[in-house]
Curated annotation (Swiss-Prot):
Positions with biased composition (Basic and acidic residues): 26-35, 93-102
Function: Cell division protein that is part of the divisome complex and is recruited early to the Z-ring. Probably stimulates Z-ring formation, perhaps through the cross-linking of FtsZ protofilaments. Its function overlaps with FtsA.
Biased composition (Low complexity): 39-79
Protein name, per record: Cell division protein SepF
Keyword Membrane tagged: no
Gene name in the database record: sepF
Disulfide feature: none
Alphabetized Gene3D superfamilies for the sequence: SepF-like protein (3.30.110.150)
Pfam families: SepF
Region annotation (Disordered) ranges: 1-120
GO CC, any one term: cytoplasm
Key words of the record: Cell cycle, Cell division, Cytoplasm, Septation
Organism: Streptococcus equi subsp. equi (strain 4047)
Subunit structure: Homodimer. Interacts with FtsZ.
Length: 220
């Protein structure tokens, strides 16, 4: 029995050494595994940091190039954008010039028409009549009604007919506010109220005689 106990003690001693060695190995392995894990985890972190550090450098180098490329594009866009405005401004200037020219042209034409119309209104015509019978006196009075001057020459009428015509024309001129003036030996000027005639004194036979009773008319 004593021998068995001694053997058992020895066996247990060796068993405890093996167990302790195994435990030591396990503990060392456990210590190594976290170290390796930490190294493995640290390595990806270092790789990621290195990648991150390398990645921002590329955009920093690319940014000036992109900015340099964007500047000509922006300048070209600005120049292209300015061209339509310049074209629009030129078109506006030409349009305004055409409008001014169009407005000035009608004004000039309207002024010409006004001047022509005023000149036409102020224009006075003188009709020359050679009455041969008493009925021609009515035509002379009709011309006076439309504000026309009439130069009457009685050289183709007899004295009695000429006196009747003068009497009729003189009465019509007073009604129409016209004037009848003798301008020659057998010629008389009939004018409307808006026409004034200044006749110089001439040596006319029987000048002091009344117009309606002048019988000294020359006949051919």
């Amino acid at each position: 029995m004593a021998i068995k106990d001694a053997f058992n003690k020895m066996i247990s001693y060796f068993d405890t050494d093996g167990v302790s060695e195994v435990e030591e190995e396990l503990s060392s392995k456990k210590q190594e595994e976290p170290v390796t894990k930490s190294q493995q985890t640290s390595r990806p972190n270092q790789q990621q940091q290195a990648a991150r550090a390398s990645q921002p450098q590329q955009p920093k180098q690319a940014r000036p190039q992109m900015q340099a490329q964007q500047r000509p594009q922006s300048q070209s866009r600005a120049a292209y954008a300015e061209r339509p405005y310049q074209g629009q401004s030129q078109a506006r200037v030409s349009h305004d010039y055409n409008d001014r020219r169009a407005t000035s042209a009608p004004s000039a034409s309207s002024r010409r028409e006004q001047y022509q119309h005023a000149a036409h209104q102020e224009q006075t015509t003188i009709a020359l009549k050679y009455p041969r019978k008493y009925e021609d006196a009515q035509e002379i009075v009709d011309l006076l009604i439309v504000n026309e001057c009439v130069l009457i020459d009685f050289q183709y009428m007899l004295d009695a007919q000429a006196r009747r015509c003068l009497d009729f024309i003189d009465g019509a001129s007073k009604v129409l506010y016209g004037t009848l003036q003798r301008v020659g030996s057998s010629m008389y000027l009939l004018t409307p109220s808006n026409v004034s005639v200044n006749i110089e004194e001439m040596n006319i036979p029987n000048n002091g005689q009344d117009i309606g009773f002048d019988f000294d008319m020359k006949r051919r």
